[in-house]
Amino acid sequence: MQLYTYLYLLVPLVTFHLILGTGTLDHGDALTERRSTDATALKPEPVLLQKSSARSTNDNGKDTQMKRILKKRGNKARGEEELAEKAPEFARELAN
């Protein structure tokens, strides 16, 4: 009876020791290699952040392009040239 009790307790301990100690499962697949390849396969590729040429910001993250545009326009909401260019479009929209 004592032999069966020792085997009952010993077999799971030996099994877990072999699995965790050697890092292998059945068919000799290594746990550590599989995890590392799976982890690298799931990692997204690094995205290179580039500042858009349309927007430029200062060190505080404020939009400096809008500042320049407003300064050039004289702090008007829209430039006179821009209104003159879009006048036919506005007229068409109002007519519809």
From Swiss-Prot:
Tissues expressing the protein: Expressed by the venom duct.
Key word Nucleotide-binding present: no
Site (Important for selectivity): residue numbering on this chain: 86
Cofactor note: Divalent cations stabilize the toxin the in alpha-helix conformation.
Superkingdom per UniProt: Eukaryota
Signal peptide: 1-21
Residue stretches of biased makeup (Basic and acidic residues): 77-96
Entry-annotated residues carrying 4-hydroxyproline: 88
GO molecular function (one): ion channel regulator activity
Binding site for a divalent metal cation: 81, 85, 89, 93
Record-stated family: Belongs to the conotoxin B superfamily.
InterPro entries, A to Z: Conantokin_CS (IPR005918)
Name the record gives this protein: Conantokin Rl-B
Outcome of swapping residue 85 to K: No change in activity
Keywords assigned: Amidation, Calcium, Gamma-carboxyglutamic acid, Hydroxylation, Ion channel impairing toxin, Ionotropic glutamate receptor inhibitor, Magnesium, Metal-binding, Neurotoxin, Postsynaptic neurotoxin, Secreted, Signal, Toxin
In-chain residues carrying the UniProt-annotated modification 4-carboxyglutamate: 81-82, 85, 89, 93
Disordered, as annotated region: 51-96
Annotated GO CC locations: extracellular region; host cell postsynaptic membrane
Propeptide position ranges: 22-78
Major site of localization recorded for this protein: secreted
Entry PTM: Hydroxylation of Pro-88 is important for NR2B/GRIN2B NMDA receptor selectivity. Removal of hydroxylation does not change global NMDA receptor antagonism (tested on WT neurons), but it decreases the inhibitory potency on NR2B/GRIN2B NMDA receptors and increases the inhibitory potency on NR2A/GRIN2A NMDA receptors. Hydroxylation of Pro-88 locally disrupts a small region of the divalent cation-induced alpha-helix but does not destabilize the entire helix.
UniProt site (Important for activity (Pro and hydroxyPro)): 88
Subcellular location per the Swiss-Prot or TrEMBL entry: Secreted
Provenance organism: Conus rolani (Cone snail)
